[in-house]
A protein has these predicted regions:
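Amphipathic alpha-helical coiled-coil segments
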Residues: 48-63, 135, 139-158, 169, ...
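Bacterial N-terminal signal peptides
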Residues: 14-24
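Acidic, low-complexity, intrinsically disordered peripheral segments
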Residues: 6, 81, 412-450
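A glycine-/polar-enriched beta->alpha junction
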Residues: 37-47, 54-69, 102-120, 130-137, ...
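Small/polar, glycine/serine/threonine/aspartate-rich low-complexity segments that form flexible
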Residues: 74-107, 231-242, 275, 288-328, ...
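Sec/Tat signal peptide C-region and signal peptidase I cleavage site
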Residues: 25-29
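Amphipathic alpha-helical coiled-coil scaffold segments and their short linker/junction regions
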Residues: 39-40, 188, 222-290, 437-450
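Periplasmic alpha-helical coiled-coil/stalk elements that build and connect Gram-negative outer-membrane
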Residues: 3, 30, 138-252, 357-360, ...
Length: 450
């Protein structure tokens, strides 16, 4: 193969090809990973968070700029008209031009207040980054929930359609038996009643699919009607196991959880704000340099031209501003206490959420295993009722009841698998690990639709 064809495609190119294929072919089935990649590009909530992050991190260069040299230029061109009277003496009306040009340079030499404001801005920028990371993690959860909701709705519709087909077949058989004089009218009416309920459920299932697909399309900005499907043969419990120890996850969530990191940055910003308030009344020292030129400064020096150069150090010492400094310190201290309490609350909530999601995965896997056995048993009951019907021991209604129980168990099994997958990605999101690799793992539990 020529070398040019072995060149690895960049990620944007691969994503563009994915979108083109998804748009061009109505038979294209979008998997969970592809849905997440599209959502990363198109989700409005994430894009708004990105813009908010870009704006938030500008606080640091803005604060740092106040510690750099500031250079300014001012210039004026004036036309002065002076009418002067000294007692009874009237002086002639004077008209003369006045010009002024000044170039000033100022460099802070000692300003602990500005240094504290810079540290506060750095913490604010970190909180913006934590917020953006949190939105990325939440997007993975939202896409997973939306995608699996579509699959579950389609699974429910397929089971209902299967029940409808079976009920219609049983209804035809019951009608033939009644016509032949060996059936009873009650069986026909009961089957029809069950069929009406199933038809209503089918309509509701179709509406649920449309709503779920609309929710997913809002995230991906891509209308797709073909999806992967839930398949018991593809569901791999071993890939979802989180280990037997909860403690490592609780420790990890304190270090990596986006909400905890955001609150830590906010606490650090509040501490820096307190430092800034404490140093606001400290002396400041600036180096100054100035070059100026003036002409026509007043009526006595109409034709004068003055040039001056100034170089020196300026000391500013705030003395009293009506209690401003004390109030600022009290306010900053209260804000620090608030941020510390919010940090501790975020840590407790993150650990609590991680514990819930962790046990949801473990309990979900156990429930899936139990429902798999229940589904196999329910199918055996259906087969046994069918054999008993042929032997004349069971009725058509018995078969329908067994099939309904089997369908309900199958639906419960599908719901258990979906809940287990969602709980798993929530655990990953809580420790900032809900990325493309995690979504790829989830996609391996699904099967392309035929």
């Amino acid at each position: 193969m020529p070398a040019i064809f072995r060149t690895r495609l960049s990620r944007p190119v691969c994503l563009a090809l994915t979108i083109v294929c998804c748009t061009a072919s109505p038979l294209f089935a979008m998997d969970l990973l592809q849905a997440y990649q599209l959502a990363l590009q198109n989700d409005r909530q994430l894009r708004a968070a990105q813009a908010q992050h870009d704006a938030g991190i500008e606080a640091l260069p803005q604060a740092a700029s106040r510690l750099y040299p500031s250079l300014g230029w001012s210039s004026s061109r004036l036309s002065v008209q002076q009418d002067r009277r000294d007692g009874a003496t009237q002086f002639p009306l004077q008209r003369y031009p006045s010009q002024s040009d000044t170039l000033s340079l100022r460099q802070p030499l000692y300003s602990p207040h500005l240094e504290a404001l810079k540290l506060q801005a750095a913490s604010t920028a970190l909180s913006s980054s934590a917020t953006l990371q949190g939105e990325q993690q939440n997007l993975a959860v939202r896409v997973t929930e939306a995608y699996l909701t579509v699959l579950l709705a389609r699974e429910r519709e397929a089971l209902i359609k299967s029940q409808i087909h079976s009920a219609q077949s049983r209804l035809e058989a019951a009608q033939k038996q009644f016509t032949a004089g060996v059936g009873i009218r009650t069986d026909i009416e009961e089957i029809r009643a069950q069929l009406d309920v199933l038809l209503a459920q089918a309509l509701q299932a179709a509406q649920s699919i449309s709503a779920a697909q609309a929710d997913l399309s809002m995230l991906t900005s891509q209308a797709v009607t073909n999806f992967f499907v839930l398949d018991g043969n593809s569901f791999q419990s071993d890939k979802l196991r989180l280990g037997q120890e909860l403690a490592p996850w609780l420790e990890m969530v304190l270090q990596r959880n986006h909400e905890v990191r955001y609150r830590q940055a906010q606490r650090d910003a509040a501490q820096a704000s307190l430092d800034a308030a404490n140093t606001e009344d400290w002396p400041n020292v600036d180096a100054m340099a100035q070059i100026s030129r003036n002409s026509g400064e007043n009526a006595y020096f109409v034709n004068s031209d003055t040039k001056s150069r100034t170089l020196g150090v300026q000391l500013n010492v705030p003395l009293y501003q009506g209690g401003w400094f004390s109030s600022r310190k009290r306010q900053a201290l209260a804000n620090l206490r608030e941020s510390q309490d919010l940090l501790e609350r975020a840590q407790l909530l993150a650990q609590n959420d991680a514990q819930k999601a962790y046990f949801a995965v473990h309990e979900g896997l156990a429930r899936v295993a139990a429902l798999q056995n229940a589904a196999a048993s329910a199918q055996l009951v259906v087969t046994a009722n069918q054999k008993s019907y042929r032997a004349g021991v069971r009725t058509t209604l018995d078969i329908l009841a067994a099939e309904q129980r089997a369908a309900q168990v199958a639906l419960d099994l599908a719901e258990a698998r979906v809940q287990c997958l969602i709980a798993w990605v929530r655990v990953k999101a809580l420790v900032a690990q809900a990325d493309e690799n995690s979504l790829r793992t989830l996609s391996s539990h699904l099967t392309p639709s035929e």
